[in-house]
């Protein structure tokens, strides 16, 4: 499939859609919780355990992040980082940051509207440790939650989406997916035939398959 060609026009033949799947961070949930974990709580704990200042700890921790990079599974695995940095147990730290979970304003209305017409699923690159907190107030809207990291030990590749469709018992053409990462949420699912939309909240793209808000998704779905 020529993904870039398909990106130049809105997906045709949207009839027969059974499942709408959503990315989580940057799509349903703001970055606040993740920022609090990766750039506040972890450096603070590292500083305390090593007897150094917060700024120095932040610099050292971020250097370790960059050595791994976001194309490796470890990047997304909080238990890996707590072990590597000798920070103890992650769960209490995450629990203390739960108040930082924020949903985008339109999320509940969109999920409420779509849940009566489609099966809703989560297709996330976040670990289940994160999803437990991120989805705490909206999980009842979803019939299935998939974590590429925790469930399949992979990034959000075409194979991940293929396995998701198999688990849901649907063909890729019966699924719409929306998320904010061009590669993981648009290119990868599009390669197997999923009707994917790129969520661009900053409105940096003029592609028809890009949405500025989740409210715009319903325009493309059959009545």
Residue ranges and their predicted role:
Residues 2-20, 112, 118-223:
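Asp-based, Mg2+/Mn2+-dependent phosphohydrolase catalytic module
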Residues 11-109, 129:
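N-terminal helical cap/lid subdomain that shapes the substrate entry/recognition surface
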């Amino acid at each position: 499939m020529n993904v870039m060609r398909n990106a130049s026009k809105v997906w045709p033949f949207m009839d027969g859609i059974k499942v709408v799947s959503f990315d989580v961070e940057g799509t349903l949930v703001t970055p606040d919780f993740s920022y609090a974990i990766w750039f506040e709580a972890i450096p603070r704990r590292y500083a305390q355990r090593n007897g150094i200042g917060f700024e120095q700890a932040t610099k050292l921790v971020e250097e370790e992040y960059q050595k791994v990079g976001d194309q490796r599974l470890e990047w997304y695995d909080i238990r890996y980082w707590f072990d590597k940095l000798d920070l103890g147990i992650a769960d209490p730290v995450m629990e203390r940051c739960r108040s930082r979970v924020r949903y985008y304003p339109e999320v509940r209305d969109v999920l409420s509207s779509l849940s009566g017409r489609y099966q809703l699923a989560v297709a996330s690159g976040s670990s289940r440790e994160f999803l437990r907190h991120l989805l705490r107030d909206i999980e009842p809207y979803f019939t299935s939650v998939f974590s590429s990291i925790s469930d399949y030990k992979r990034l959000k590749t075409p194979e991940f989406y293929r396995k998701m469709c198999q688990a849901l018992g649907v063909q890729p053409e019966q699924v719409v997916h929306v998320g904010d990462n061009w590669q993981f949420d648009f290119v990868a699912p599009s390669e197997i035939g999923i009707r994917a939309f790129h969520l661009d909240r900053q409105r940096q793209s003029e592609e028809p398959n890009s949405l500025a808000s989740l409210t715009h998704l319903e325009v493309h779905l059959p009545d």
